[in-house]
Design a protein with these regions (language model features):
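Outer-membrane beta-barrel translocator domains and adjoining extracellular loop/strand segments
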Residues: 44-48
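Short, flexible active-site-proximal loops enriched in glycine and acidic residues
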Residues: 37-43
Length: 199
């Protein structure tokens, strides 16, 4: 659809941003598939026939998610997804950094295509390039998290801090990196989203 829109409106300066947001959003869903099912098909075209779809290795899905996020990151906004305004509920740099941090943290698992052989990759040998520096997956996790913290996110403090994140009206939390708009007035259709279906 984006390619069709680009042809129809070739001078639209927001096309690059929209394309990066869609790629990063798709990468997030592939991350969920990777985390829950490991080996899933990677489909990048809406015209591919089902007979041509093949199951990908876990390491291939890992590499795909990583590539999509790393390539999309520069074109994403540095705004907060949780803040009211133009980028509310949209994919931003902090969201991509959050997914990359989770990807790096679990890289030993996600790059292991044969989890039955008792041999697993060593995280010290799984390299990421972050801010122009090649680092192992553990160091990459810290760097991605530092980017998020530098963007103004933090852990909620106090006795009720953690539980406050799960309250019905938690829109003011400084922990909310990526939000799903659920305002009963502005976003009525999203109120049907099953908030606890994954956990």
């Amino acid at each position: 659809k984006l390619v069709m829109l680009q042809k129809e409106y070739p001078d639209n300066e927001l096309f690059g941003t929209y394309k990066s947001e869609v790629r990063a959003l798709r990468a997030m869903y592939y991350y969920y598939l990777l985390d829950m099912f490991a080996r899933v098909p990677i489909v990048e075209s809406s015209t591919i026939e089902i007979k041509d779809v093949r199951q990908s290795k876990r390491s291939e899905v890992f590499a795909f998610v990583r590539k999509e996020l790393e390539e999309s990151l520069p074109d994403l906004s540095d705004a907060k997804s949780a803040a009211e305004g133009e980028y509310y509920g949209r994919m931003t740099q902090s969201v991509a950094n959050y997914i990359l941090a989770k990807l790096a943290l679990n890289a030993e698992i996600y790059t292991d295509d044969d989890w039955t052989d008792a041999v697993k990759p060593d995280g010290k040998n799984i390299k990421f390039t972050v801010d122009g520096e090649e680092v192992n997956c553990w160091e990459a996790t810290v760097k991605y998290c530092n980017r998020i913290t530098a963007s103004g996110y933090a852990l909620t403090q106090g006795l009720n801090g953690f539980s406050a994140n799960f309250a019905a009206k938690n829109e003011g939390s400084i922990e909310n990196i990526f939000v799903i708009p659920m305002d009963p007035t502005l976003y009525k259709a999203n109120m049907m989203y099953l908030t606890r279906s994954r956990h």
